[in-house]
């Protein structure tokens, strides 16, 4: 998934033409094969890995993911429903972040560098650098 996504992301910025069409085709193919919706408009840093082919992952168009991150299956990085409407913001994930299986990170929030997000955690507030966050809603259990 990672290599194909990078090609689609690069081509998605072309205005019209064959490459833009191929970008959408690759995005659709990844959705069908891996049951994921990782937007080619999202910004994903180098050496970031979607484990298990990113099965079930959803990444918002405006999400930013740093370098050297590990994202496991069924992770959602999306906008938050607030006061009867979507807030439109998407998470910004720092460098060297591990996001456990099934974690949900919602809204215009920042997850710092060197953070571990536990499996099935629901993150709706900022998480500082060098922290471990777990639970629903996520709570910081360790600061480095």
Residue ranges and their predicted role:
Residues 134-144:
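Short, basic/aromatic-enriched C-terminal tail that caps enzymatic domains
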């Amino acid at each position: 998934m990672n290599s194909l996504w990078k090609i689609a992301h690069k081509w998605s910025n072309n205005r019209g033409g064959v490459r833009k069409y191929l970008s959408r085709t690759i995005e659709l193919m990844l959705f069908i094969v891996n049951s994921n919706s990782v937007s080619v408009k999202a910004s994903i840093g180098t050496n970031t890995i979607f484990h298990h082919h990113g099965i079930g992952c959803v990444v918002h168009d405006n999400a930013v993911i740093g370098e050297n991150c590990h994202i496991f299956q069924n992770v959602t990085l999306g906008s938050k429903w607030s006061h009867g409407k979507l807030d439109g913001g998407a998470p910004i994930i720092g460098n060297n972040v591990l996001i456990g299986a099934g974690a949900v990170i919602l809204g215009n929030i920042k997850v710092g560098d060197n953070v571990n997000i536990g499996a099935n955690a629901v993150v709706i507030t900022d998480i500082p650098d060098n922290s471990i966050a777990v639970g629903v809603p996520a709570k910081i259990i360790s600061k480095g």
